[in-house]
Curated annotation (Swiss-Prot):
Oligomer status and interactors: The cytochrome bc1 complex is composed of a cytochrome b (QcrB), the Rieske iron-sulfur protein (QcrA) and a diheme cytochrome c (QcrC) subunit. The bc1 complex forms a supercomplex with cytochrome c oxidase (cytochrome aa3).
Assigned keywords, A-Z: Cell membrane, Electron transport, Heme, Iron, Membrane, Metal-binding, Repeat, Respiratory chain, Translocase, Transmembrane, Transmembrane helix, Transport
GO cellular component: a single term: plasma membrane
Catalytic activity: a quinol + 2 Fe(III)-[cytochrome c](out) = a quinone + 2 Fe(II)-[cytochrome c](out) + 2 H(+)(out)
MF terms in GO: heme binding; iron ion binding; ubiquinol-cytochrome-c reductase activity
SUPFAM superfamilies reported for this sequence: Cytochrome c (SSF46626)
Protein's recorded name: Cytochrome bc1 complex cytochrome c subunit
Positions that bind heme c 2: 175, 178-179
Coiled coil regions, renumbered to chain: none
Disulfide bond positions: none
Organism: Corynebacterium diphtheriae (strain ATCC 700971 / NCTC 13129 / Biotype gravis)
Broad class of the protein's primary localization: membrane
Length: 281
């Protein structure tokens, strides 16, 4: 009897251990399976943040843009074009530079103090891009909007002179005919004009080249590569920030203002000299 009891006890212990082992294996397997099919927390959070940003952009759009561009971004005849497919880049340029919303319909939207903050501008841009895609804002690796990193293909703690040299050639070939060779802007036809480039930040200049706002032609990456666009920005910023070696630059408009100033000063000097000679005789 004693041996039989011992055998039954050992069998009971083995069954209990086997059951516990099976339960542990089952729970472990279930945990692994759940972990495999459950979205990563960071990805889910990022998606939620993106959706919240798009919703914020839609709310802002419905207040300020819907009248001219339509409830579905399809545009409204004689008011505003469709925004489907324009992307976040074009939206950033127009809103961040204050050109949109426009004060009134005119030949060309003028730069003015922006109505919306940087964060609100990015929200509107995210909403527009979510509806049709298009050229995107350039971001740094840390998620911030690229600014100084666009100052030349080889920018690192400062503008590379080689980038400025290449950018100067590219600017002269593609931009100077309208914007003047130092980015001072100039008059066009029908009341339009090429704006001064000084107030524009790096992202605005990049997006202007990429998307071609208003009267400006588009420069796709096939016409001007991303690095070439950056080199042009390097030249523009270098021209703005480098002091004039000759003193007062007369607005940086080149031979027109310089020639006029020389002519006016020369005439005044000649008239004064003639009057002085006449008074002496």
């Amino acid at each position: 009897m004693t041996n039989a009891k011992k055998v039954r006890a050992r069998r009971k212990i083995r069954r209990t251990a086997a059951g516990a082992m099976a339960l542990a294996v089952g729970l472990t397997g279930a945990g692994i399976l759940v972990n495999a099919v459950t979205p990563d927390a960071q990805v889910a959070t990022a998606q939620q943040d993106e959706q919240a940003l798009i919703q914020e952009g839609k709310d802002l759009y419905d207040v300020a843009c819907i009248t001219c561009h339509g409830a579905n971004l399809q545009g409204v005849k004689d008011r505003g074009p469709s925004l489907i497919g324009v992307g976040s880049g074009a939206t950033y340029f127009q809103v961040h530079s204050g050109r949109m919303p426009m004060l009134r319909n005119e030949a060309q939207a003028k730069r003015k103090t922006p109505r919306y903050s940087e964060a609100q501008t990015l929200a509107i841009a995210a909403y527009v891009e979510a509806n049709g895609g298009g050229p995107s804002i350039v971001y740094n690796k840390d998620g911030s909007v690229a600014m100084e990193s666009l100052r030349g293909a080889n920018y690192k703690d400062g503008i590379d002179p080689a980038d400025v040299a290449r950018g100067s050639d590219l600017f002269r070939l593609n931009c100077a005919s309208c914007h003047n060779f130092t980015g001072r802007g100039g008059a066009l036809s029908s009341g339009k004009y090429a704006p001064v480039l000084d107030p524009a930040n790096e992202q605005e200049i990049y997006q202007a080249m990429l998307t071609g706002p208003q009267n400006m032609p588009k420069f796709s990456d096939r016409q001007l590569s991303a690095d070439e666009k950056k080199d042009i920005i390097a030249y523009i910023k270098s021209a703005k920030e480098t002091p004039s070696q000759g003193g007062w630059n007369l607005g940086g408009l080149g031979p027109v203002t310089e020639g006029m100033m020389m002519w006016l000063v020369g005439i005044v000097v000649l008239v004064a000299a003639a009057m002085w000679i006449g008074s002496r005789s």
